[in-house]
UniProtKB/Swiss-Prot annotation:
One of its GO terms (cellular component) is cytosol. Is required not only for elongation of protein synthesis but also for the initiation of all mRNA translation through initiator tRNA(fMet) aminoacylation. Residues 641-741 form the tRNA-binding domain. A motif ('HIGH' region) lies at residues 11-21. This is Methionine--tRNA ligase. Homodimer. HAMAP family: Met_tRNA_synth_type1 (MF_00098). Its cofactor is Zn(2+). It is found in: Cytoplasm. One of its GO terms (biological process) is methionyl-tRNA aminoacylation.
Length: 741
């Protein structure tokens, strides 16, 4: 039986995780692993922080702290962020573990023993001002391949080509900014040319790889592989395990030892689980049944598809008292392209980024997972847009998925006391619905297996769309009056679709999946197969699964988070979407009176000289308040006139923005035997989530009228004192449609 060893690229422990990281290496892997678990496959999902190398020492130097303090802080921060984003690693380790030191030094010595390493004295970057050898990342200059400026000496962020300080144009120190020199220094190099032919044949045989990965790797190999240094002039890292004065005080290059972390972290995890030797079946080719799959971003393709396999080859066979075997080479490396932000590449140094931990302070993890999956850069770069984020969540997640689940759960509770009803005779649409469930499982599974996560999520959402159309076509609110059996069948089939969605969503939206499982009152373990909800099973009462993303939330996020890190970036984003007066108003409301000075200072830092300040109260507003206080002269109506009004109790089941008006909502109200669409001027006073699920009073026999192009089939009743608006709501639940007398 096939087993899976799944890894995500080890993040550097020198800073937080942004949405580009998540979309590239972590969310795709999590979707894949959750699917495998639902299928009952044997799978191990491993990751951990990369805690050596220049990114860590560079940050420590800038902040006047030790590298140990930096890695300890960010290991915990990154681990917590992944947990909040529902990334379900079996174990999240670190490369500061003793087992990693031991194994990395063992790999070095084995490669040396097998003749694949050579010691060379070469010119290394040196800063006369700081009196130190400079690691590649401490050197910046112009990329000789694409001409991009301010690129680090290890890899160009623009074209992705690996670099060395020697080939940079106009290289300078990234610490002090002065031009660098080059001094002699002894280092060990791996002879990559020893593996060129073997690597080429191996890559050519990987016909199941993504074309972008396979073509990139073959292009590299065809250019010819050269010796590359695997030791560095640093004092933080894994010491070179030799009694050699030439390399005394030097460490293993992080690009050599970091991927070994996949194995060392696996060993540590299984040792803690009391399965000390089980790591071998995942990493050694004992039976040909293990598939090692590395999820990475495209900048890591050469390191995982060329250098890492070469290190495994350089080690040779692993031998101990129990086994003798070759290492498992990667089975697949499904690298994603880049995620951009509003048309520009993510930049951590300029804070042009969506930091995951900050995003999750404002929105649920499922919102980020849904949007990143929907725009996942699987074969080409994609773009994170706040406007598109709002649109996709509100139209697809809330209006489609959430609406269907809520409708089905509401009807089973209203008409069948929360018990799944027996089905009657099936019509063609009923049968099609049940067939759609089976098709959704088959097709979604195939798409996930082929790393087409964007299409897989789309296929799941198509089932929710079908569910809504099925519900609309069957019209259970009408058949409930005349044909209970038909209504029972519609509700039963709808609940089967809801259960199917609860399983199908698990890889993508684990929290939504759990909410559906809770609504259906299920305790069974989810499996990637479908067993129908039995008639007679009791479910729970409906509640809204999602809330809409609002402009106020987006403004607050940009101001409070991006604005603090980089006011210029915040200004660009705010000016793209919003008027300054609206930004000021929302910010002051969100911060509140106690934090007003803080809010104004933040806005001033964002807008600079363009800041117009707090908008004064409109002239006449105070007069309006006074008029309300004075009140109008009472005018009487006859009882007969009042009796003409059909006032009824309803429940708000859906709230959408009006497509043509900024201050209006389009609200759907359930009256028991029908659902009415109303247009209401409540946007200034209520958020959508504050309206959903509430019982309200409407005028049901008001002549329908189009308001800004949308028909309103009644009117909500509310009190207005000139400053605040309050809906009229019954003080206890009554039957929907009950008349006000």
């Amino acid at each position: 039986m096939v087993r899976y060893m799944v890894t995500s690229a080890l993040p550097y422990a020198n800073g937080p995780i942004h949405a580009g990281h998540l979309a590239g290496a972590y969310l795709p892997a999590d979707i894949f692993v959750r699917y495998l678990r639902l299928k009952g496959e044997e799978v191990l999902f491993i990751c951990g922080t990369d805690e050596h190398g220049t990114p860590i020492t560079f940050r420590a130097l800038k902040e006047g702290r030790s590298p140990r303090e930096i890695v300890d802080e960010f290991h915990e921060h990154i681990k917590t962020t992944f947990e909040r984003a529902k990334i379900s690693f079996d174990f999240f380790g670190r490369t500061e573990l003793p087992v990693h030191y031991r194994l990395s030094q063992e790999f070095f010595l084995k490669a040396l023993e097998n003749g694949h390493l050579v010691k060379k004295v070469t010119k290394q970057a040196y800063c006369e001002h700081d009196k130190m050898f400079l690691p590649d990342r401490y050197v910046i200059g112009t990329c000789p391949y694409c001409g991009a400026e301010n690129q680090r000496g290890d890899q160009c962020e623009v074209c992705g080509h690996p670099l060395t300080p020697e080939i940079l144009i106009n290289p300078r120190c990234n610490i002090c900014g002065n031009p660098i020199t080059f001094k002699d220094s002894a280092h060990y190099y791996i002879r990559m040319q020893d593996f060129e032919e073997r690597l080429k044949k191996w890559v050519e045989s990987q016909e199941h790889w993504k074309p972008n990965v396979r073509n990139t790797v073959l292009g590299w190999i065809n250019e010819g592989l050269e010796e590359r240094a695997i030791t560095r002039d640093l004092d933080w890292g894994i010491p070179v395990p030799l009694d050699d004065e030439d390399v005394k005080g030097k460490v293993l290059y992080v690009w050599f030892e970091a991927p070994i972390g996949y194995i060392s972290i696996t060993i540590e995890h299984l040792k803690r689980e009391g399965k000390e030797n089980e790591w071998k079946k995942f990493w050694l080719n004992l039976d040909g049944e293990t598939k090692v799959i590395h999820f990475i971003g495209k900048d890591n393709i050469p390191f995982h598809a060329i250098f890492w396999p070469a290190f495994l080859m350089a080690y040779g066979k692993y031998r101990d008292e129990e086994v003798e075997a070759e290492w498992n080479l990667p089975y697949d490396i499904p690298a994603n392209e880049y995620l951009n932000l509003e048309g520009k590449k993510f930049s951590t140094s300029r804070n042009w980024a969506i930091w995951v931990h900050e995003f999750l302070d404002v929105w649920p993890a499922d919102y980020l997972r849904y949007y990143l999956t929907a725009i996942m850069p699987e074969t080409r770069d994609s773009d994170f847009s706040f406007e598109d984020f709002k649109k996709k969540i509100n139209e697809e997640l809330v209006n489609n998925l959430g609406n269907f689940v809520h409708r089905a759960m509401t009807f089973v509770n209203r008409y069948f006391d929360g018990v799944v009803p027996e089905r009657g005779e099936l019509n063609d649409l009923d049968r099609q619905a049940l067939e759609e469930i089976e098709k959704a499982f088959k097709e979604t599974g195939e798409l996930i297996s082929n790393y087409r996560f964007k299409d897989a999520l789309k296929r799941v959402m198509e089932l929710a769309i079908f569910g809504n159309r099925y519900f609309d076509y069957q019209k259970p609110w009408k058949t409930a009056k005349e044909n209970r059996e038909r209504t029972a069948t519609t509700v039963n089939v709808s609940l089967q679709i809801v259960k199917a969605l609860g399983i199908l969503l698990e890889p993508f939206l684990p929290d939504a999946s759990e909410k559906i499982w809770h609504l259906l009152n299920l305790e069974e373990v989810k499996k990637w197969s479908f067993e129908e909800l039995p008639a007679g099973h009791r479910v729970r009462k409906a509640f809204p699964m999602f809330r809409k993303v609002t402009d106020g939330e987006i403004i607050y996020f940009i101001v409070n988070y991006i604005g603090r890190g980089n006011p210029d970036s915040a200004k660009i984003l705010l000016n793209k979407y919003y008027k300054q007066e609206d930004v000021v108003k929302v910010t002051l409301e969100r911060f509140g009176e106690k934090r007003k000075d803080e809010a104004l200072a933040l806005l001033k830092s964002i807008y600079g000289d363009e800041f117009k300040g707090e908008k004064p109260e409109k002239a006449g507003k105070a007069e309006k308040k006074e008029k309300v206080k004075e009140g109008k002269k009472m005018e009487y109506v006859s009882f007969d006139e009042f009796a003409k009004l059909d006032l009824r109790v309803g429940k708000i089941i859906e709230v959408n923005d009006h497509p043509n008006a900024d201050r209006l909502y389009v609200v759907k109200v359930d009256l028991g035997d029908e659902v009415r669409q109303l247009v209401a001027g409540l946007k200034k006073y209520y958020k959508p989530e504050e309206l959903l699920g509430h019982y309200v009073v409407i005028i049901a026999n008001l002549e329908p009228k189009k308001l800004r192009g949308v028909e309103s089939q009644g009117m909500l009743l509310a009190a207005d004192d000139g400053e605040r608006v309050a809906l009229l709501m019954p003080d206890k639940e009554v039957k929907l449609g009950a008349r006000i007398r």
